């Protein structure tokens, strides 16, 4: 057996056979390695902080700028996913652990040069389904929780909303929602996941669509369909919220969902026509996007930056494209 302790135990007289478990980060881990101690990294892998899989995938116990010698680097044993459980229940624990920890596992057993996030997410989607086949409830429980919140009405509009929002990150939930032993953990924030699949797909399509300038045809139909769905779902959620008190806290998000859909459709229309919008539209749109960027019910839209990119492209219609340097 090996004794393992957090960073704080690293004192001058500490025996070298004790392993340092670093929550402080790679710098603290490297310091221990230089002093001859073996170490494990947890910083970057705290899954209770609700960071997306891409965040964890970018965290390496031996980062590219590491100055450890090859011999010192051997003292870095790897990493460990960690989770404090104040905000989890039997209904939500699987969605808070899986499938992100599969991405962490791949990060830890892969060379540092493996960094293709898009391909990671492609494969993670397959792994997620395989985990469900094994009996994990990270996917199934979400729909169950949404049905309960909707009082067994059609949850399609709620699913649309949840696909583009994520719980606030790190410790912001504590700041926005003081917790007691009686705090319910059955809200939309608990049904939402750290990786909003719809938001990720939308962001990727916007990038490809804008790269297709000046034609703006690539993924235009798909983006138009998704934005229209946001508009329709936002409108449909209003009556549902009126009938379900448990959903009242997300009412500002329904307006935001509709307006994000509206703004995105209008921006695409300007790009399609090749006509820049009027200044009044730009000013009104800025106000809508600023409002949509605010968190409500400890949830935040993950699509606001991509919609802003559409708006900016529309505003810049007719302007000279920025030159890129080959240097």
Residue ranges and their predicted role:
Residues 1-327:
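Substrate-binding groove of N-acetylhexosamine-processing glycoside hydrolases
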């Amino acid at each position: 057996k090996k004794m393992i302790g957090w960073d704080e135990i690293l004192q001058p007289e500490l025996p070298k056979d004790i392993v340092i478990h670093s929550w402080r980060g790679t710098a603290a881990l490297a310091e221990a390695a230089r002093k001859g101690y073996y170490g494990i990294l947890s910083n970057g892998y705290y899954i209770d902080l609700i960071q997306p899989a891409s965040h964890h995938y970018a965290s390496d116990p031996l980062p590219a700028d590491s100055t450890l010698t090859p011999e010192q680097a051997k003292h870095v044993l790897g990493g460990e996913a960690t989770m404090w459980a104040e905000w989890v229940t039997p209904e939500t624990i699987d969605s808070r652990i899986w499938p992100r920890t599969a991405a962490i596992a791949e990060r830890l057993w892969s060379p540092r040069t493996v960094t293709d996030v898009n391909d990671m997410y492609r494969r993670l989607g397959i792994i997620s389904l395989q985990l469900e086949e094994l009996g994990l409830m990270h996917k199934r429980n979400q729909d169950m929780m949404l049905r309960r919140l909707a009082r067994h009405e059609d949850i399609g509009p709620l699913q649309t909303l949840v696909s583009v929002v994520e719980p606030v990150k790190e410790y912001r939930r504590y700041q926005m929602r003081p917790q007691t032993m009686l705090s319910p953990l059955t809200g939309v924030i608990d049904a939402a996941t750290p990786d909003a699949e719809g938001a990720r797909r939308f962001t990727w399509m916007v990038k490809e669509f804008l790269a297709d300038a000046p034609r703006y045809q690539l993924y235009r139909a798909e983006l138009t369909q998704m934005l229209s769905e946001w508009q329709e779902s936002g409108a449909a959620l209003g009556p549902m919220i009126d009938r379900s008190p448990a959903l009242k806290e997300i009412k500002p998000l329904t307006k935001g969902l509709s307006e994000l859909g509206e703004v995105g459709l209008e921006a695409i229309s300007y790009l399609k026509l090749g006509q820049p919008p009027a200044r009044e539209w730009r000013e009104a749109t800025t106000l809508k996007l600023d409002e949509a960027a605010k968190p409500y019910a400890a949830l935040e839209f993950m699509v606001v930056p991509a919609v802003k990119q559409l708006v900016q492209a529309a505003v810049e219609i007719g302007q000279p494209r920025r030159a890129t340097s080959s240097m």
